[in-house]
Amino acid sequence: MHPSDFGVRTLDGVADDWPIDYWTLEPYFAENDRMTGVAGLAGDPAYPPHQPNLPPVPLGKTGTRYARAINQLGWHWWPSDIAVATMEYDGRGKCINLGHCTPGCAQGAKASVDITYWPHALRARVELRTRCRVREIATNEHGMASGVIYYDPNGVERFQPAEVVVLAANGIGTPRLLLNSASTRFPTGLANSSGLVGKNLMLHPWPQVFGYVAEEVDGDRGPQTVMWSKQFYETDRSRGFVRGYTLQFTRGTGPANEAITSMAAGRLPWGKADPNRAYGRSRDLPVPAQGASVHARVSDHAGSDGRSQ
Protein backbone atom coordinates (compact mmCIF):
# COMPACT_ATOMS: atom_id res chain seq x y z
CA MET A 1 0.00 0.00 0.00
CA HIS A 2 1.00 3.62 -0.57
CA PRO A 3 0.36 6.70 1.60
CA SER A 4 -2.35 7.81 -0.84
CA ASP A 5 -4.40 4.67 -0.11
CA PHE A 6 -5.08 5.98 3.39
CA GLY A 7 -6.63 9.25 2.20
CA VAL A 8 -8.78 8.45 -0.83
CA ARG A 9 -11.63 10.72 0.28
CA THR A 10 -9.35 13.73 0.82
CA LEU A 11 -7.29 13.17 -2.31
CA ASP A 12 -9.83 11.79 -4.79
CA GLY A 13 -13.29 12.28 -3.29
CA VAL A 14 -14.16 8.57 -3.17
CA ALA A 15 -14.96 6.11 -0.37
CA ASP A 16 -13.43 7.23 2.94
CA ASP A 17 -10.12 8.04 4.59
CA TRP A 18 -8.49 5.72 7.09
CA PRO A 19 -8.40 7.01 10.69
CA ILE A 20 -4.60 6.55 10.62
CA ASP A 21 -1.99 7.23 7.96
CA TYR A 22 0.61 5.06 6.24
CA TRP A 23 3.46 6.33 8.39
CA THR A 24 1.72 5.21 11.58
CA LEU A 25 1.82 1.64 10.28
CA GLU A 26 5.18 1.81 8.53
CA PRO A 27 7.26 0.66 11.55
CA TYR A 28 5.04 -2.42 11.82
CA PHE A 29 5.35 -3.10 8.09
CA ALA A 30 9.13 -2.93 8.52
CA GLU A 31 9.11 -5.27 11.53
CA ASN A 32 6.95 -7.78 9.68
CA ASP A 33 9.31 -7.61 6.69
CA ARG A 34 12.24 -8.29 9.03
CA MET A 35 10.57 -11.28 10.66
CA THR A 36 9.47 -12.85 7.38
CA GLY A 37 12.67 -12.03 5.51
CA VAL A 38 11.53 -9.88 2.60
CA ALA A 39 13.84 -9.71 -0.40
CA GLY A 40 13.88 -6.62 -2.59
CA LEU A 41 15.82 -3.63 -3.85
CA ALA A 42 15.77 -0.29 -2.04
CA GLY A 43 15.34 2.95 -3.95
CA ASP A 44 12.13 2.37 -5.92
CA PRO A 45 11.08 5.93 -6.91
CA ALA A 46 7.40 4.92 -7.01
CA TYR A 47 7.29 3.42 -3.52
CA PRO A 48 7.76 4.89 -0.02
CA PRO A 49 11.35 4.59 1.25
CA HIS A 50 12.10 1.24 2.86
CA GLN A 51 15.04 -1.13 3.19
CA PRO A 52 14.44 -4.81 2.37
CA ASN A 53 16.50 -7.18 4.49
CA LEU A 54 17.63 -9.43 1.65
CA PRO A 55 18.87 -8.98 -1.95
CA PRO A 56 16.19 -9.15 -4.66
CA VAL A 57 15.24 -12.32 -6.48
CA PRO A 58 17.27 -12.41 -9.73
CA LEU A 59 15.26 -11.32 -12.76
CA GLY A 60 16.35 -14.31 -14.84
CA LYS A 61 15.41 -14.70 -18.48
CA THR A 62 11.75 -13.97 -17.78
CA GLY A 63 12.48 -10.71 -15.98
CA THR A 64 14.97 -9.62 -18.61
CA ARG A 65 12.36 -10.16 -21.32
CA TYR A 66 9.76 -8.22 -19.33
CA ALA A 67 12.21 -5.37 -18.70
CA ARG A 68 13.01 -5.06 -22.39
CA ALA A 69 9.34 -4.76 -23.28
CA ILE A 70 8.50 -2.34 -20.44
CA ASN A 71 11.46 -0.13 -21.31
CA GLN A 72 10.16 0.13 -24.88
CA LEU A 73 6.89 1.47 -23.45
CA GLY A 74 8.72 3.93 -21.22
CA TRP A 75 6.94 2.65 -18.10
CA HIS A 76 8.22 2.39 -14.54
CA TRP A 77 9.35 -1.03 -13.29
CA TRP A 78 11.28 -2.33 -10.31
CA PRO A 79 12.23 -5.74 -8.85
CA SER A 80 9.35 -6.85 -6.63
CA ASP A 81 9.49 -7.23 -2.89
CA ILE A 82 8.92 -10.89 -2.09
CA ALA A 83 8.97 -12.91 1.15
CA VAL A 84 11.54 -15.40 -0.13
CA ALA A 85 15.00 -15.83 1.41
CA THR A 86 17.59 -15.12 -1.29
CA MET A 87 20.35 -16.00 1.20
CA GLU A 88 20.37 -18.01 4.42
CA TYR A 89 18.22 -16.12 6.90
CA ASP A 90 17.02 -16.82 10.42
CA GLY A 91 17.67 -20.55 10.12
CA ARG A 92 16.04 -20.86 6.69
CA GLY A 93 17.77 -22.05 3.55
CA LYS A 94 18.12 -19.71 0.59
CA CYS A 95 16.07 -20.02 -2.59
CA ILE A 96 17.70 -22.40 -5.08
CA ASN A 97 15.09 -22.02 -7.84
CA LEU A 98 13.36 -25.34 -7.28
CA GLY A 99 10.38 -24.01 -9.20
CA HIS A 100 7.27 -21.93 -8.62
CA CYS A 101 6.14 -21.41 -5.03
CA THR A 102 2.45 -22.35 -5.12
CA PRO A 103 2.79 -26.00 -3.93
CA GLY A 104 5.07 -24.99 -1.05
CA CYS A 105 8.83 -24.79 -0.59
CA ALA A 106 10.86 -27.85 0.40
CA GLN A 107 13.89 -25.61 0.81
CA GLY A 108 12.19 -23.47 3.46
CA ALA A 109 13.04 -20.27 1.61
CA LYS A 110 9.45 -19.17 1.08
CA ALA A 111 8.14 -17.44 4.19
CA SER A 112 5.11 -18.87 5.95
CA VAL A 113 3.86 -18.61 9.52
CA ASP A 114 5.12 -22.07 10.49
CA ILE A 115 8.77 -21.21 9.72
CA THR A 116 8.82 -17.53 10.69
CA TYR A 117 6.60 -16.53 13.64
CA TRP A 118 5.88 -19.92 15.19
CA PRO A 119 9.48 -21.02 15.90
CA HIS A 120 10.22 -17.75 17.70
CA ALA A 121 6.99 -17.99 19.68
CA LEU A 122 7.68 -21.58 20.71
CA ARG A 123 11.22 -20.73 21.79
CA ALA A 124 9.70 -17.99 23.95
CA ARG A 125 7.60 -20.71 25.67
CA VAL A 126 4.35 -19.77 23.96
CA GLU A 127 1.86 -22.64 23.94
CA LEU A 128 0.48 -23.11 20.44
CA ARG A 129 -2.95 -24.77 20.19
CA THR A 130 -3.74 -25.74 16.63
CA ARG A 131 -7.03 -26.87 15.07
CA CYS A 132 -8.97 -24.84 17.65
CA ARG A 133 -11.62 -22.26 16.89
CA VAL A 134 -12.61 -19.34 19.10
CA ARG A 135 -16.36 -18.83 19.45
CA GLU A 136 -16.43 -15.56 21.36
CA ILE A 137 -14.51 -13.23 23.65
CA ALA A 138 -15.64 -13.29 27.27
CA THR A 139 -15.81 -10.14 29.41
CA ASN A 140 -15.84 -9.57 33.16
CA GLU A 141 -18.11 -7.45 35.34
CA HIS A 142 -16.10 -4.37 34.38
CA GLY A 143 -16.63 -4.91 30.66
CA MET A 144 -12.99 -5.88 30.08
CA ALA A 145 -11.92 -8.93 28.08
CA SER A 146 -11.32 -11.85 30.44
CA GLY A 147 -10.56 -14.68 28.01
CA VAL A 148 -12.00 -16.63 25.11
CA ILE A 149 -14.49 -19.45 24.68
CA TYR A 150 -13.23 -21.88 22.06
CA TYR A 151 -13.68 -25.35 20.61
CA ASP A 152 -10.73 -27.74 20.88
CA PRO A 153 -9.78 -30.19 18.07
CA ASN A 154 -12.42 -32.65 19.34
CA GLY A 155 -15.18 -30.05 19.28
CA VAL A 156 -15.28 -29.70 23.06
CA GLU A 157 -16.10 -26.19 24.29
CA ARG A 158 -13.44 -24.73 26.57
CA PHE A 159 -12.65 -21.43 28.27
CA GLN A 160 -9.18 -19.88 28.32
CA PRO A 161 -8.81 -17.02 30.82
CA ALA A 162 -6.54 -14.17 29.78
CA GLU A 163 -5.44 -10.76 30.99
CA VAL A 164 -5.06 -9.56 27.39
CA VAL A 165 -6.81 -10.84 24.26
CA VAL A 166 -5.20 -10.00 20.90
CA LEU A 167 -7.36 -10.32 17.78
CA ALA A 168 -5.55 -11.17 14.55
CA ALA A 169 -8.19 -13.02 12.54
CA ASN A 170 -8.11 -10.94 9.33
CA GLY A 171 -10.81 -8.67 7.93
CA ILE A 172 -13.57 -11.28 8.18
CA GLY A 173 -12.67 -13.38 11.21
CA THR A 174 -11.99 -10.40 13.48
CA PRO A 175 -15.41 -8.71 13.05
CA ARG A 176 -17.05 -12.13 13.25
CA LEU A 177 -15.62 -12.64 16.74
CA LEU A 178 -16.42 -9.11 17.88
CA LEU A 179 -20.02 -9.37 16.64
CA ASN A 180 -20.48 -12.86 18.08
CA SER A 181 -19.31 -11.55 21.47
CA ALA A 182 -22.48 -9.51 21.96
CA SER A 183 -23.91 -9.38 25.49
CA THR A 184 -26.29 -7.34 27.60
CA ARG A 185 -23.54 -4.80 28.16
CA PHE A 186 -22.48 -4.88 24.50
CA PRO A 187 -25.68 -5.62 22.53
CA THR A 188 -24.11 -4.86 19.13
CA GLY A 189 -20.86 -6.70 19.82
CA LEU A 190 -17.52 -5.76 21.34
CA ALA A 191 -15.79 -2.51 20.35
CA ASN A 192 -18.78 -1.60 18.19
CA SER A 193 -20.17 1.57 19.73
CA SER A 194 -19.61 3.20 16.33
CA GLY A 195 -21.56 0.50 14.49
CA LEU A 196 -18.66 0.18 12.04
CA VAL A 197 -17.31 -3.23 13.02
CA GLY A 198 -17.27 -5.30 9.84
CA LYS A 199 -17.97 -2.30 7.61
CA ASN A 200 -15.63 -0.85 4.96
CA LEU A 201 -14.13 -4.26 4.19
CA MET A 202 -11.26 -4.03 1.69
CA LEU A 203 -10.33 -7.19 -0.20
CA HIS A 204 -7.60 -7.59 -2.77
CA PRO A 205 -9.03 -9.07 -5.97
CA TRP A 206 -6.73 -9.41 -8.94
CA PRO A 207 -7.10 -10.61 -12.53
CA GLN A 208 -4.44 -12.54 -14.43
CA VAL A 209 -3.41 -12.20 -18.05
CA PHE A 210 -1.15 -14.76 -19.71
CA GLY A 211 1.05 -14.20 -22.73
CA TYR A 212 3.53 -16.09 -24.86
CA VAL A 213 6.91 -15.21 -26.37
CA ALA A 214 8.93 -17.02 -28.98
CA GLU A 215 12.17 -17.45 -27.03
CA GLU A 216 12.91 -19.69 -24.05
CA VAL A 217 12.45 -17.70 -20.81
CA ASP A 218 12.83 -20.43 -18.16
CA GLY A 219 9.47 -19.64 -16.61
CA ASP A 220 9.69 -22.73 -14.41
CA ARG A 221 12.89 -21.64 -12.65
CA GLY A 222 12.51 -19.63 -9.51
CA PRO A 223 9.68 -17.86 -7.66
CA GLN A 224 6.82 -16.54 -9.76
CA THR A 225 7.20 -12.93 -8.63
CA VAL A 226 9.74 -11.03 -10.71
CA MET A 227 8.95 -7.32 -10.94
CA TRP A 228 6.18 -4.76 -10.68
CA SER A 229 5.18 -1.55 -12.38
CA LYS A 230 3.61 1.35 -10.50
CA GLN A 231 3.10 3.28 -13.73
CA PHE A 232 -0.67 3.37 -13.18
CA TYR A 233 -0.85 3.28 -9.37
CA GLU A 234 -1.54 6.90 -8.45
CA THR A 235 -4.50 8.93 -9.70
CA ASP A 236 -4.15 10.55 -13.12
CA ARG A 237 -7.43 12.25 -13.95
CA SER A 238 -6.54 12.45 -17.63
CA ARG A 239 -7.35 8.73 -17.80
CA GLY A 240 -10.97 9.43 -16.89
CA PHE A 241 -10.97 7.69 -13.49
CA VAL A 242 -9.35 7.99 -10.08
CA ARG A 243 -7.08 5.61 -8.16
CA GLY A 244 -5.08 2.94 -9.93
CA TYR A 245 -3.36 -0.42 -9.73
CA THR A 246 -0.07 -2.30 -9.70
CA LEU A 247 1.04 -4.42 -12.62
CA GLN A 248 2.76 -7.51 -11.22
CA PHE A 249 4.95 -9.39 -13.71
CA THR A 250 5.52 -13.05 -12.94
CA ARG A 251 7.00 -16.22 -14.33
CA GLY A 252 4.69 -18.81 -15.79
CA THR A 253 3.79 -21.82 -13.67
CA GLY A 254 2.80 -24.33 -16.32
CA PRO A 255 -0.39 -26.26 -17.13
CA ALA A 256 -0.36 -28.45 -14.01
CA ASN A 257 -0.47 -25.47 -11.64
CA GLU A 258 -3.13 -23.75 -13.74
CA ALA A 259 -5.29 -26.86 -13.51
CA ILE A 260 -4.80 -27.15 -9.73
CA THR A 261 -5.62 -23.51 -9.00
CA SER A 262 -8.69 -23.65 -11.24
CA MET A 263 -10.34 -26.52 -9.37
CA ALA A 264 -12.39 -24.13 -7.21
CA ALA A 265 -14.19 -22.90 -10.33
CA GLY A 266 -15.16 -26.45 -11.23
CA ARG A 267 -13.70 -26.12 -14.71
CA LEU A 268 -10.46 -25.18 -16.40
CA PRO A 269 -10.80 -21.57 -17.64
CA TRP A 270 -9.52 -21.23 -21.17
CA GLY A 271 -10.13 -19.49 -24.46
CA LYS A 272 -11.63 -16.15 -25.40
CA ALA A 273 -14.40 -16.32 -22.79
CA ASP A 274 -12.04 -16.63 -19.83
CA PRO A 275 -11.04 -12.92 -19.59
CA ASN A 276 -14.69 -12.07 -18.89
CA ARG A 277 -14.14 -13.32 -15.33
CA ALA A 278 -11.59 -10.59 -14.73
CA TYR A 279 -13.30 -7.54 -16.22
CA GLY A 280 -14.27 -4.82 -13.77
CA ARG A 281 -12.18 -6.16 -10.88
CA SER A 282 -9.87 -3.91 -8.91
CA ARG A 283 -8.81 -3.08 -5.37
CA ASP A 284 -11.82 -2.64 -3.12
CA LEU A 285 -12.37 0.79 -1.61
CA PRO A 286 -13.68 1.29 1.96
CA VAL A 287 -17.45 1.71 1.70
CA PRO A 288 -19.96 0.93 4.50
CA ALA A 289 -22.10 -1.29 2.26
CA GLN A 290 -19.24 -3.75 1.83
CA GLY A 291 -18.38 -5.77 4.86
CA ALA A 292 -18.77 -8.85 7.04
CA SER A 293 -21.84 -9.34 9.21
CA VAL A 294 -23.25 -12.19 11.28
CA HIS A 295 -26.25 -14.13 10.00
CA ALA A 296 -29.19 -14.00 12.39
CA ARG A 297 -30.43 -17.56 11.78
CA VAL A 298 -27.65 -19.68 10.28
CA SER A 299 -25.12 -21.38 12.57
CA ASP A 300 -21.62 -22.43 11.62
CA HIS A 301 -20.38 -26.03 11.75
CA ALA A 302 -19.49 -25.68 15.44
CA GLY A 303 -22.95 -24.45 16.36
CA SER A 304 -22.11 -20.80 16.96
CA ASP A 305 -25.10 -18.48 16.78
CA GLY A 306 -23.97 -16.68 13.64
CA ARG A 307 -21.92 -17.17 10.52
CA SER A 308 -20.03 -14.42 8.72
CA GLN A 309 -21.60 -13.43 5.43
Question: What are these model-derived regions, one by one?
Answer:
Residues 18-22, 28, 194-308:
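FAD cofactor-binding and catalytic pocket of flavoenzymes
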Residues 8-134:
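Conserved redox-cofactor binding core of oxidoreductases
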Residues 4-8, 46, 305-309:
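Short acidic (Asp/Glu) and glycine-rich catalytic loops that position anionic groups and cofactors
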Residues 1:
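Conserved phosphate/anionic-ligand binding catalytic regions in large, soluble enzymes, centered on
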Residues 107, 123, 136-140, 148-221, ...:
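Glycine-rich loop(s) and the adjacent beta-strand/alpha-helix scaffold that form part
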Residues 4-9, 89-90, 176-181:
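Short, solvent-exposed loop/turn and secondary-structure capping segments
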Residues 64, 141-146:
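A short, compositionally biased
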Residues 21, 73-75, 84, 89-94, ...:
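C-terminal lid/capping helical subdomain adjacent to the catalytic/cofactor pocket in oxidative enzymes
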